[in-house]
Amino acid sequence: MANGLKFSPRKTALALAVAVVCAWQSPVFAHGSEAHMVPLDKTLQEFGADVQWDDYAQMFTLIKDGAYVKVKPGAKTAIVNGKSLDLPVPVVMKEGKAWVSDTFINDVFQSGLDQTFQVEKRPHPLNSLSAAEISEAVTIVKAAPEFQPNTRFSEISLHEPDKAAVWAFALQGTPVDTPRTADVVMLDDKHVIEAVVDLQNKKILSWTPIKGAHGMVLLDDFVSVQNIINTSSEFAEVLKKHGITDPGKVVTTPLTVGFFDGKDGLQQDARLLKVVSYLDTGDGNYWAHPIENLVAVVDLEAKKIIKIEEGPVIPVPMEPRPYDGRDRNAPAVKPLEITEPEGKNYTITGDTIHWQNWDFHLRLNSRVGPILSTVTYNDNGTKRQVMYEGSLGGMIVPYGDPDVGWYFKAYLDSGDYGMGTLTSPIVRGKDAPSNAVLLDETIADYTGKPTTIPGAVAIFERYAGPEYKHLEMGKPNVSTERRELVVRWISTVGNYDYIFDWVFHDNGTIGIDAGATGIEAVKGVLAKTMHDPSAKEDTRYGTLIDHNIVGTTHQHIYNFRLDLDVDGENNTLVAMDPEVKPNTAGGPRTSTMQVNQYTIDSEQKAAQKFDPGTIRLLSNTSKENRMGNPVSYQIIPYAGGTHPAATGAKFAPDEWIYHRLSFMDKQLWVTRYHPTERYPEGKYPNRSAHDTGLGQYAKDDESLTNHDDVVWITTGTTHVARAEEWPIMPTEWAHALLKPWNFFDETPTLGEKKK
C-alpha cells in the first residue's frame, strides 16, 4: 500500500499558468548566495503533490501526505498545516509562471511537521501480495504442465496464514514462519481452475479444476462483447427497427444471465452474457438513451450472438441529459478548508493504521475491496481483540421488472464482476475531504499483470458532533467533541458508484456505511407525463423520472462478513428483547419494562430478520467487565438510511433468485468460523443453480455457543426512483453499527484516570 496524490486544479480558478519544462536561473538569493530556481508545477507534481491555484486569492495550495501548504508568490512565509513556516526563498512569478527554489520540497514538506507514515519493521502476515509476488505467482502457474496459453486470471490474492498465528503476531509480535502463499483463480475458456502457490519455495501446492462453475466476468469480456455487437450484421438489422443506422454509436453493457432452470431457453453449461444497449448521442450520458426491448445473448466462447430477444419497439429517448455540467452554470462556493496544524492523529505503518486506541490492518481485495484485519482497541494499556476480519462479503442489485430487457437483472456486483478490480480512484476535495491521505493499491489484471490503482483508498479524520454533553444548572458546561476515523473506498460497477466507509469512533463503535450514487438504470417508455394514456402501464414497475424514461424499482442489498472476536475467539450469540410485563411489585403502575435475555445457540436459529426494537449481541461469556456483565458487541444491521430499508428480498418464495441467494432475505446470520466460507452468495455465483453461500454455510446448523463465530449482516435499501435522482443520483446511504456493550467499565472517552 503506498500513498499517491494527483494534480487537480481548482474548478473556480484558472489552471496553473506554469507549463514549463526547463529550470530558470533567477537573481533570487538564499542565505547570501544565488538560489537555483525550478518550475513549481513540474517539480511538485513529480514529487507527488496535489497542486491548486486560487486565482481570486492569488495563492497556491499544495497537498502531500499529511502536509497542507498555502503560499503566495513573493511571500517570505508559507502556512503549513495552519502554522507559519519561514521560506529561505519565496515563490517567484515570472512571465505568468511560478518558480521555487530547488530546496523548496525539503524546506516545506520535509520540515519534520508530519509523521503520518512510519517504516514497517516487521511485515504484517496479511499484507497484500506485492507486485513482485503477483508476478512470481503468475510465473509459477504458467510453468505448470496443465496451464493453457489462453488462460486468464480472475483473482490473485494472499492465501491467508493460520488465524491463530496471525493473532499471535498482532497481539504478542510472534513471527509467522509459514511461507508467503498465493491463491490464484484462473479461467480457461469456460473452465475455472484454482491453484495455491508457495511463493517462497516457488512451487504449486494444489491445482483444482472447479466443476460446474462459470467464473467471473472479466474486463476483456466487455471489449469482446462490444466488438461482437459492432460487427454483427444481424444486430445491425435489428437496430434499424429502432431508427439506428450506425452500430458504432451503440454502447453495450454485458450482464450475467442469472438462472431460471431452462425457462429462459439458455444452455446451462455455456458461458453466456446478455447485452442491453444504449445510444451514444454525444451528450456524455448514453444511459439516458436506452434501446429498449432489445437483448442480445452472446456466447463468449464462440464469440458470437446466439440469440436476439425483442419486445415492442420503443423509440429511443433522445433528449440530451448531460450530467457533467456542460450545459449548466454551477454556483460558486467559498472554499472550506480543513487543516491539521500539529499533524495527523493517526499513523500508517506499512499497511497497519493506528488512531487513538484503535489498531487495524488494511488491504485491498480484487473481489470485495478493503479487508480490515486484526482490529484491536487499547483499553487503558491492554490491547483487546474486537474483530479478526471485516469486509464486504457480497452484494446484489435485483430489479423487479419482468419485461424482456429486465427480468434477468440481478447484479452480483462483487461476485460476478469483482468490485475491487472496479475500484474508482478517489478525487481529493470531492470524493474525500482535502485532509485525506490517499493510498495506492496493487492488484492483478486478467492477464496476471500487477496493476496499481492510484488513490484507491482514502483515510481521514473528521469532526462528528459532540461525543457527550451535560449542562448542570449553575455549573460549567461539560462536553467534548466526537472524532471519527474514516476508511473510504469507491467502486464503479456500470451505472452505479458505491461508496463504502468504515468509520471508527473513539468510543469503541465501528460504523459501516454503504452509499449508492451514479446513474440509475432506466427504461425507455412511450409516456412523457403521467397524463399520457400509457403512463399507468409504463410505470407499473417504476417511476416516470423524465420524458419517456422510467426509473425501475430495485434493491441495493449489501452483506458484510464480520469475523468478530470479542476479547477472544470463543463467543456466543445473545438476544435481549425488551418487553412489557405486569407489575407484581405493588404501587399504582400496572406494567413494567423488562428485558428477556436468552442465548441463540445454532446457525439456523441465528438467521433472522432484524427487528430494530430488539438487541443482538456477540458476547464473550468467559470475560466480564468490573460489574460482572459479559463483554459484548451489539450488532445493528440497519441503523438508518436515506432510502426505504430493504427488510427482505422483494421476490416471491418460488423465485429461483430467492433460493439461490438466501442471504438477501434475512439481515442477521451467524456461522461457525471456517476459513473457506467467505462469500454470502457463494464463491462462484454466476449462473449458480443452488445456494452455495450463507444458506449452505448454515445448513449443518452448527453450535454457536462458546465457539469462534462469524457475523454476517445484510443491510440495504429498496430503491423507488424519484425525479431528484435524475440524471445523476445524490448519494443515498444505508448505515450499520457495531457497538460495545458492557465491553468497557465506563464511558471510554473519559480517558485514563489521573495518577
Predicted regions span which residues?
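Exposed beta-strand-loop-beta-strand "reactive/processing" segments of non-cytosolic proteins
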Residues: 148-200, 246-300, 356, 487
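Primary recognition of N-terminal secretory signal peptides and signal-anchoring hydrophobic helices
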Residues: 2-11, 15-122
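Surface-exposed coil/turn segments at beta-strand junctions on protein surfaces, enriched
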Residues: 33, 93-95, 177, 268, ...
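Extended effector regions of multi-domain proteins
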Residues: 199-204, 208-217, 240-242, 280-370, ...
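Extended intrinsically disordered, low-complexity coil regions enriched in Ser, Thr, Gly, Ala
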Residues: 50-56, 69-79, 112-120, 148-149, ...
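Short, non-transmembrane alpha-helical segments in secretory-pathway proteins
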Residues: 125-170, 218-262
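Interaction-mediating elements
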Residues: 40, 50, 120-122, 136, ...
